[in-house]
């Protein structure tokens, strides 16, 4: 696979070519995903739960993300890598710049930050330094205490309008990509069509430019109950490779997510 760039991902949006993304945390799985044709991998702070065994993403440190980013980059040299800035690692511009440098040096193409209007000045400062940024709005796991748990966001009209405003403000400030998590399908469609940057959905319906799943959910190895928007692709496949290829096919052809995976 040739190296994937942000320009290519933006072209896919313009040409209405959907793409599949996935989380990964190590060399072996990232190499497998890359060989299957996954163009975008997220080194997410979800590793706090899937790898470290915590009950949330909050204990994850910047050193954890840097370590796993290095491993994933070795396995997927040409894949577009997005790495999370974990909880309280970007509470001001100085801290955000310092920790972004660590992550980019570890091999990421882009950093991801959760939040809305309060992030604007930080986004603008990073963008002015030509750093690629992925925003993340809707259900933002680093703020699950404030949100009252892991709940769908944007159901009420005023909440939906707030998310639309935040998406537009973040794009204006300089984000290059946006993740929408657990918002109604119609709202995700409106936001996606309002932005010129690629929009990736998780639990937000099929009308975004791309989809992302946590690898453990996709492969059916998550401990306990999984979110209703996930799908175990390994159930219908006889190998991990075929499960990933099926996931890619269903995303590219708007089969997944279906209505039962959406809100």
Curated annotation (Swiss-Prot):
Its main location: cytoplasm. Keywords: Cytoplasm, Magnesium, Metal-binding, Pantothenate biosynthesis, Transferase. Mg(2+) binds at residues 45, 84, 114. It is found in: Cytoplasm. GO terms for cellular component: cytoplasm. Pathway: Cofactor biosynthesis; (R)-pantothenate biosynthesis; (R)-pantoate from 3-methyl-2-oxobutanoate: step 1/2. Its EC number is 2.1.2.11. Homodecamer; pentamer of dimers. This is 3-methyl-2-oxobutanoate hydroxymethyltransferase. The lineage of its organism: Bacteria, Pseudomonadati, Pseudomonadota, Gammaproteobacteria, Enterobacterales.
């Amino acid at each position: 696979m040739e190296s994937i760039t942000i320009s290519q991902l933006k072209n896919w949006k313009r040409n209405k070519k959907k793409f599949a993304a996935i989380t990964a945390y190590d060399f072996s799985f990232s190499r497998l995903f890359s060989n299957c044709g996954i163009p975008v991998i997220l080194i997410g702070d979800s590793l706090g739960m899937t790898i470290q065994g915590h009950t949330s993403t909050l204990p994850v440190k910047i050193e954890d993300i840097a370590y796993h980013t290095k491993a994933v980059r070795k396995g997927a040299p040409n894949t577009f890598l997005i790495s999370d800035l974990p909880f309280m690692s970007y509470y001001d511009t100085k801290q955000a710049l310092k920790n972004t440098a660590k992550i980019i040096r570890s091999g990421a193409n882009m950093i991801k930050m959760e939040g809305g209007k309060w992030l604007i000045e930080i986004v603008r400062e990073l963008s002015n330094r030509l750093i690629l940024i992925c925003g993340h709005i809707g259900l933002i796991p680093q703020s699950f205490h404030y949100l009252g748990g892991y709940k769908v966001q944007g159901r009420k009209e005023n909440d939906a309008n707030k998310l639309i405003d935040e998406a537009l403000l973040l794009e204006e400030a300089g984000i290059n990509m946006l993740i929408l998590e657990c918002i109604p399908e119609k709202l995700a469609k409106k936001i996606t069509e309002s932005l010129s940057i690629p929009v990736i959905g998780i639990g937000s319906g099929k009308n975004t430019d791309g989809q992302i799943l946590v690898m453990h959910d996709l492969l059916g190895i998550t401990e306990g109950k999984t979110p209703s928007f996930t799908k175990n692709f390994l159930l219908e496949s006889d190998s991990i490779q075929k499960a990933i290829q099926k996931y890619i096919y269903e995303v590219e052809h708007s089969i997944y997510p279906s209505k039962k995976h959406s809100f």
